[in-house]
């Protein structure tokens, strides 16, 4: 394999891994109508299942970053994938809520290391001018899994039990983990880069003392509250509010997820293009972030329009959200030393997943007690604007590649 193509080969492999992770987490929401024929699940219980996944996902997102910084990307990513694949298979053995909740908890634990691992692969192999594009491609894996989930799950349901969905997904993940162990290698210079001129891994307490880190975590908390609600509840909204059956969900639910994939790539491509044209790192990251956030309010109109227009509005919002997501997860690779990239990415992801868990629980309770989807979509549509304002207020000027914010004036910069 040519040396210049190897980084992009690894980016492709990571994209597939993220696709598998999203297929696994989407299997339950897409198949919920079939599962409910065997296991009664209310709106509040559905919210609990998603919150259970997100709670452990949050904890292991933070811990997974530290885990990867300690044992490395190759082994850490493979262990993570194998863990969540086994957890996915456990869903297929469930006959009640107890095992389903346990399976969701274990699934979140495994998937928590996925994006920190992706961030480390990018930091190990690619320069700053290519990282946003690479993260955009990897983030498009979220769409890959989400787009394939409705039609594939619909096909499996036509052929047999909903339980086979989870066994099929688990087999994909275990195959990927074995392949990753065989093919992945760190670049020869990574060992010397990991300390970047003597900078040791930064302790979590010092990271959390930085206003920049707290700003990124807070922004992700808000934006992922919106994203995880849309991700998990879109199929259920189509079932409950629009009267869809599994065949209609299989035909149409993939469309907004496909738009999210285009957003993942487009945001990173646009940011990298601005950098190549000589614009500052600060401008090249923040302009696309702001434009992405401006698309999310489209979901506010969803309950008030026809189903065709609702799918279009979902698509616009999903495009903006995943453009945003890829860009915000690129920021740790820009301004933190490689030795701490996994930890910072983990803390940011922790904030996002905790936001998703809390918002999912709140959504389930609101729907159970008479609130409509209109109220929820109004809140969801406003969160990215607040998140972007927080990011602008806390991030300061993003430094050019090679400038470490923790080395300015010999002390930690927290403003």
Predicted feature locations:
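Structural signature of the two symmetry-related core transmembrane helices
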Residues: 75-89, 282-300
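Cytoplasmic helix-loop-helix junction between adjacent transmembrane helices
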Residues: 103-142
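Conserved MFS/SLC helix-loop-helix module at the cytosolic interface between two early adjacent transmembrane helices
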Residues: 59-98
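Juxtamembrane intracellular "pre-TM" segments in multi-pass secondary transporters
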Residues: 1-3, 188-217, 241
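Helix-loop-helix hairpin linking two adjacent transmembrane segments in secondary transporters
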Residues: 138-182
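Extracytoplasmic gate region of multi-pass secondary transporters
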Residues: 28-29, 211-265, 321, 325, ...
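A late C-terminal transmembrane helix in Major Facilitator Superfamily
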Residues: 333-370
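Helix-breaking motifs and short loop linkers at transmembrane-helix boundaries and internal kinks
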Residues: 40, 72, 93-99, 127, ...
């Amino acid at each position: 394999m040519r040396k210049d193509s190897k980084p992009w080969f690894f980016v492709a492999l990571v994209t597939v891994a993220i696709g598998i992770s999203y297929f696994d987490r989407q299997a339950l929401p897409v198949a919920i109508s079939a599962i409910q024929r065997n296991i009664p699940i209310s709106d509040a219980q559905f919210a609990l299942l998603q919150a259970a996944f997100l709670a452990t996902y949050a904890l292991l997102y933070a811990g997974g970053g530290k885990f990867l910084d300690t044992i490395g990307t190759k082994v850490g990513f493979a262990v993570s994938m194998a863990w969540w694949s086994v957890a996915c298979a456990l869903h297929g053995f469930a006959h009640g809520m107890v095992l389903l909740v346990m399976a969701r908890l274990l699934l979140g634990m495994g998937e928590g290391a996925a994006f920190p691992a992706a961030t480390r692969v990018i930091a190990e192999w690619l320069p700053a001018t290519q990282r946003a594009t690479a993260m955009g491609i990897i983030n498009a894996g979220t769409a890959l899994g989400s787009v394939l989930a409705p039609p594939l799950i619909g096909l499996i349901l036509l052929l047999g039990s909903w339980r086979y969905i989870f066994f099929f997904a688990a087999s994909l993940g275990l195959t990927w983990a074995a392949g990753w162990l065989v093919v992945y290698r760190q670049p020869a210079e990574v060992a010397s880069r990991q300390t970047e001129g003597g900078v040791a891994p930064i302790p979590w307490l010092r990271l959390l003392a930085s206003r920049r880190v707290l700003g990124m975590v807070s922004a992700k908390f808000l934006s992922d509250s919106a994203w995880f609600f849309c991700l998990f509840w879109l199929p259920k909204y189509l079932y409950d509010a629009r009267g869809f059956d599994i065949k209609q969900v299989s035909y149409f639910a993939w469309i907004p997820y496909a738009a999210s994939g285009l957003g993942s790539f487009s945001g990173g491509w646009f940011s990298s293009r601005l950098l190549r044209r000589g614009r500052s790192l600060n401008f090249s990251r923040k302009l696309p972030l702001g434009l992405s956030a401006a698309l999310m309010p489209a979901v506010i109109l969803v309950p008030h329009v026809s189903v065709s227009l609702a799918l279009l509005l979902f698509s616009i919002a999903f495009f903006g959200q995943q453009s945003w997501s890829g860009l915000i997860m690129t920021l740790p690779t820009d301004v933190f030393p490689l030795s701490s990239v996994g930890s910072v990415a983990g803390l940011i992801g922790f904030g996002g997943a905790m936001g998703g868990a809390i918002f999912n629980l709140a959504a389930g309770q609101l729907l159970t007690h008479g609130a409509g989807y209109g109220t929820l979509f109004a809140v969801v549509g406003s969160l990215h604007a607040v998140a972007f304002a927080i990011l602008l207020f806390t991030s300061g000027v993003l430094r050019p590649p090679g400038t470490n914010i923790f080395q300015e004036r010999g002390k930690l910069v927290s403003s």
